[in-house]
A protein has these predicted regions:
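Acyltransferase
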Residues: 5, 185-240
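N-terminal beta1-alpha1 ligand-phosphate binding loop
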Residues: 8-30, 190
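Structural signature of beta-strand start/N-cap positions in the alpha/beta core
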Residues: 31, 80-82, 146
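An anion/phosphate-binding loop that grips the pyrophosphate of nucleotide cofactors and donors
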Residues: 44
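Cysteine-nucleophile active-site neighborhood
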Residues: 53-126
């Protein structure tokens, strides 16, 4: 059976914000498939690695299914690759959340707990700042776009050339990374109304696909009306 129709592969390793990501791509007219099949991942036009919860548990589940190698191979082949939330953190080498656990190591630095003098977790709507002027990831997004965050860890030590955006939560935190075919979003674009859909549409475009205009999509997802972005973070938990 030919499964090549799965143009974007969302890596299913038993943990993560899977269906929400799939529905978000569908909202911009892009077909995405939840899969743990390495052959499907290898032939996809783009690969998405979601993640929620604990870095060590996520990496353990990925390794157990031999999907860490599938992710490495996809990146090495030049397939567009997007890590979301813990999926972005898994692109790094290590995390203080799980000493001894080894990440994918695409970015050779550590993920650390947010400073003790800030509210943890960083949860709710916040604005991305310091957008890289040549960022394809944030193409078409207005200055300081609102995105939805839920995280307690972030990488404080990232090569500035790879930083696509930052966010201020008591301190400046890396909100997104962009390096060649690899993107990482610390926030949840699939939970971030039309601005998040714009970012996913940008990703689909890099995959050679033709997404629909995100402004025509209904991206409410229970958190905000489309195009309405609160001035203060929303205190609510994402249920995945």
């Amino acid at each position: 059976m030919d499964e090549r129709f799965a143009v974007i592969a969302i890596v299913d390793y038993g943990i993560g914000n899977l269906r929400s990501a799939q529905k978000a791509f569908e909202a911009v007219g892009v077909e995405a498939r939840l899969t743990g099949d390495r052959d499907v991942i290898a032939t996809a036009d783009g690969v998405v690695l979601p993640g929620v919860g604990n870095f060590g548990q996520c990496m353990g589940a990925l390794v157990e299914r031999d999907l860490d190698r599938a992710c490495h191979d996809a990146i090495e082949r030049g397939q567009p690759f997007l890590g979301i939330c813990v999926g972005m953190q898994m692109l790094f080498a290590t995390s203080d959340e799980a000493p001894g656990a080894v990440g994918l190591g695409i970015f050779d630095s550590n993920v650390a707990l947010l400073p003790p003098d800030v509210v943890v977790p960083h949860m709710g709507w916040n604005q991305c700042t310091a957008i890289a002027p040549d960022s394809t990831m944030f193409s078409g997004l207005r200055d300081q776009p609102w995105m939805y965050f839920v995280h307690s860890y972030a990488s404080p030590d990232v090569d500035e050339a790879w930083v696509a955006a930052r966010v201020h939560h008591g301190v400046d935190v890396v909100a997104a990374v962009e390096r060649a075919n690899v993107w990482g979003a610390q926030f949840h674009p699939e939970k971030s109304s039309n601005l998040g859909l714009t970012l996913l549409a940008n990703f689909a475009s890099t995959c050679g696909l033709e997404p629909t205009d995100p402004s025509h999509a209904d991206a409410r997802s229970g958190r905000s009306e489309p195009g309405v972005y609160p001035s203060e973070p929303v205190s609510e938990t994402i249920h995945d």
